[in-house]
């Protein structure tokens, strides 16, 4: 259980007023104190976060440009999964753990062993795990991108979908968590199967779907462009849909679309929301932009008008 969930439980058990009283009492004891660290300790901490030694490289790579022009799938991966690096001649590569039909964030032991070797060979020995349930190689030389890409393809880790509709965040849900009201992983798997066509996925563009199996919100559903929250209705799995959430600098909590829908309808609902966005969007608009411009009404009408 994370700290956020522990705080929720404390507030529920103690009441908001008592919790506030305890926080203020603790703050009164520490607000005028000073955290004193000797210079040796500060220096030791700083050494733990020292940047790696980068090779001086040009920003451009002939090999990358040639393959980008010759191989559309590489070009698509380059656009979706490779981000700029502050160090010239380097790039940040995200390894998608969201294949079609896969459990979000899942990797086999063989894949993990291989990624460790790739980190040593291409990323100065460093791997990071993103909050979006993917892996990141943060220090890749741009000239090595074609070779790294081919190895990721062979491992099944080169799905070009970072930040797109099939790059779903999901908690373990009812399959693995005693707190959950409904399953999360199978919902994510079904959505990725519905949106298996990468050309369609890229045409849809930036769209973040987040799924939580209960109100503890471990899947961050409340800040998803499309949020999906599992609820229990008389022992049956239902899902409350929210729209318009964001965890970015324009942070917002999603707004409830309407009555919760049963498990068997979730994928159709998501597709209906996406199709509504595609029909209404202006050139260059993301799902979130279109939602903020047109509001909830057209999305609600699409999902509930025939009910």
Which residues make up each language-model segment?
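Peripheral terminal and linker regions in Fe-S/redox and tRNA-modifying enzymes
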Residues: 4-307
